[in-house]
Amino acid sequence: MKKFSCGFEVTKEVIGGKWKGLVLYFLMNGPKRTSELKRIIPNITQKMLIQTLRELEASGLVSRKMYNQVPPKVEYSSTELGESLKPILQELCQWGGYYAEQEYAEGEYEIVQPEQLS
């Protein structure tokens, strides 16, 4: 059993890293296929996207639904536990926008639509 000094450490362990929060954030708007997530998050590699989805699934934050059809179809969605993070992720998103506008950021950050990233 891992031991932590506060709940923030547990949160960071579960949703920390470069992509987990972002993938979760976009799944909060409804189920997505990997190709849809890849379009929304163009800077993530296919391998890293699959790894991130598997880790989020193992943590109980994301569910994977496989359809019995040809070609195979797989959708990912946030679970009830994952949805409990929605207000937190929305607040982090708002704070990021606020920070990007501050003088400390010195024009280093610009919030754009996903299609403008590729």
UniProtKB/Swiss-Prot annotation:
Coiled coil: none annotated. Keywords: DNA-binding, Transcription, Transcription regulation. It comes from the Bacteria. SUPFAM superfamilies: Winged helix' DNA-binding domain (SSF46785). Residues 6-104 form the HTH hxlR-type domain. GO terms for molecular function: DNA binding. Pfam families: HxlR. InterPro entries: HTH_HxlR, WH-like_DNA-bd_sf, WH_DNA-bd_sf. The keyword Secreted does not apply. This is Uncharacterized HTH-type transcriptional regulator YkvN.
